[in-house]
């Protein structure tokens, strides 16, 4: 078993083709019967330390990744509850704090593979959920999944038609394949985040929200300045499910103000 590669919903990245991580055991109704208990299950999960039985034929990096997976309580909880990836708990923890998903919410999930965030959105009562990815994604009960590129000029209108109106939440957990060079990796993920933000501006309803993965670094100041103009609140968060050694953060923007964005563009 090899580590899964990351994925995105845009074809403009020049790196290797993205392959969605192999989905964990999936369930039509993942998580606990009471959705408020989903994150608590992960927090209380405990694994006995497990070691690989054999390292034969595996590189050091593969051994390290496999050992990490075997001893990760979020991986164990995802398998037990039927989430497609441990990343589902990141969105659960973000939503526990910011209350972005509720009954009647229209949601677009950019770079949806393998479907964990889409599952969470449906489980938490969203009215309409559309997941978009360049690569095939197994169906998620209660959501629509399409293959496509979010940079396609026709995509914003297409997804709004599928939702039956503008989106209340655009979320992106997209990440490029990492190179190991911090500056390069940061620039790549910021390019995806900026593209997702531009897409969000085209599809969000007034008062809507935006979530995107970013890496810690210094080149996102222009993006943050634009977000602070277009949204009433912009915050960074590192959910507990995000690995401590990872430099990833999530930017949470709420209260979309399209008129402020229009004023800003006129004054530019």
Curated annotation (Swiss-Prot):
Binding site residues for S-adenosyl-L-methionine: 115, 117, 133, 149, 173
Compartments it resides in: Cytoplasm
EC number: 2.1.1.166
A UniProt-annotated Pfam family: FtsJ
HAMAP family, alphabetized: RNA_methyltr_E (MF_01547)
Protein task: Specifically methylates the uridine in position 2552 of 23S rRNA at the 2'-O position of the ribose in the fully assembled 50S ribosomal subunit.
Identification of the protein by name: Ribosomal RNA large subunit methyltransferase E
Organism: Gluconobacter oxydans (strain 621H)
Gene: rlmE
């Amino acid at each position: 078993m090899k580590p899964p590669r990351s994925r995105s919903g845009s074809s403009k990245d020049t790196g290797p083709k993205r392959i969605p991580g192999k989905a964990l055991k999936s369930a039509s109704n993942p998580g606990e019967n009471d959705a408020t208990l989903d994150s608590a299950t992960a927090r209380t999960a405990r694994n006995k330390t497990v070691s690989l039985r054999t390292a034969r034929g595996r590189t050091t990096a593969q051994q390290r990744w496999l050992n990490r997976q075997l001893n990760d309580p979020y991986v164990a909880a995802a398998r037990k509850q039927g989430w497609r990836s441990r990343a589902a708990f990141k969105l659960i923890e973000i939503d526990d704090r910011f209350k972005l998903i509720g009954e009647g919410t229209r949601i677009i999930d950019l770079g949806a593979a393998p479907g964990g965030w889409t599952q969470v959105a449906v489980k938490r009562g969203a009215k309409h959920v559309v997941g978009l990815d360049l690569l095939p994604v197994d169906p998620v009960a209660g959501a629509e999944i399409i293959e496509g590129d979010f940079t396609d000029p026709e995509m914003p209108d297409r997804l709004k038609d599928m939702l039956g109106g503008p989106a209340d939440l655009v979320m992106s957990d997209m990440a490029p394949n990492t190179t190991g060079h911090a500056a390069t990796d940061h620039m790549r993920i910021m390019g995806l985040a900026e593209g997702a933000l531009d897409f969000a501006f085209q599809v969000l309803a007034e008062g809507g929200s935006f979530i995107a993965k970013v890496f810690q670094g210094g080149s996102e100041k222009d993006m943050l300045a634009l977000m602070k103009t277009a949204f009433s609140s912009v915050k960074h968060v590192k959910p507990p499910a995000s690995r401590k050694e990872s430099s990833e953060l999530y930017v949470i923007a709420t209260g979309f103000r399209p008129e402020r964005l229009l004023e800003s563009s006129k004054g530019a």
